[in-house]
Design a protein with these regions (language model features):
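N-terminal glycine-rich phosphate-binding loop and ensuing alpha1 helix
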Residues: 1-55, 85
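Well-ordered alpha-helical segments embedded in enzymatic catalytic cores
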Residues: 19-23, 96-100, 198
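Residues at the starts of beta-strands that form the adenosine-phosphate
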Residues: 33-35, 133-136, 207
């Protein structure tokens, strides 16, 4: 049975932590530690994870009986993050989700999906966005092939590469930066999409720039992707690890 029967995709684990934690940790590594999470399908799982974060990540002593007491031993470093968790609707499309968190946004802000990891330099991305002065920036990445690649000479295998990067063409890798003006292109109707409509309109108005990230990127779309990312983590080859 698929893990996403029981939890949102962003809570599927790489190693001992959800992929969502890995994404947030990457932002925090570059000095960005204030987060607003747009919750949808099984959003309560994410709320409970962060509400009980100390319990999940430290040793605990439980005293039973009349003088019941729980002591959490803070034996692990605690992330200095501020997280606002917002219920935006189970079937809401992405544009509407972003519009529904507008009250928590004061300045330029970043947006990413909850299922993609990368070694992108977030600080460089933000600098690029500030310099061009347009409303939005999207990160373009080279996707990985779904299949292993074999290099051969005269029938002899010289190299086997699991899920190599496809060098031709780039795709939307997430990791957006926006001015607050983006909210003028969104609305709170649940059918307000993000890529179809708002980003297309920004493109027509010459208000969307692309930051070409030439490093590594991967997305957890399938169980096979989960196995691949966990294998990188287990081998110490997790390119996104901060």
């Amino acid at each position: 049975r698929e893990e996403t029967e029981f939890r949102p995709k962003s809570m599927v684990k790489i190693g001992t932590k959800p992929i969502l934690w890995h994404i947030m940790n990457h932002y925090a590594h570059h000095g960005f530690n204030q987060f607003v999470l747009c919750l949808g399908y099984k959003g309560e799982v994410i709320k409970e994870y962060f509400y009980h974060y100390m319990l999940h990540n430290n040793d605990v002593t439980v005293k039973l009986g009349q003088d019941r007491q729980i002591t959490i031993h803070e034996n692990n470093q605690v992330e200095d993050w501020e997280i606002t968790l917002v219920d935006t609707g189970e079937n809401t499309l992405k544009g509407a989700r972003i519009h529904k968190i507008q009250r928590y946004i004061d300045n330029d802000f970043m947006v990413t999906y909850g299922d993609g990891v990368s070694d992108i330099n977030i600080s460089n991305l933000v600098d690029f966005h500030k310099k061009h002065g347009k409303i939005g920036t999207v990160t373009g990445v080279s996707p990985r092939s779904s299949y292993g690649q074999i290099k051969q000479e005269d029938g002899k295998v010289c190299q086997f590469i699991e899920k190599p990067k496809i060098e031709e063409g780039i795709i939307n890798g997430g990791f957006f930066v926006f001015q607050k003006k983006i909210f003028d292109y969104l609305n709170s109707n649940n059918d307000c999409d993000f890529e179809i409509g708002p980003l297309e309109q920004l493109t027509k108005e010459d208000q969307l720039m692309v930051y070409h990230h030439k490093g590594d990127w991967a997305c957890m779309d399938t169980y096979r992707d989960s196995v691949f990312l966990n294998s990188l983590w287990d081998k110490g080859k997790a390119f996104w690890k901060a």
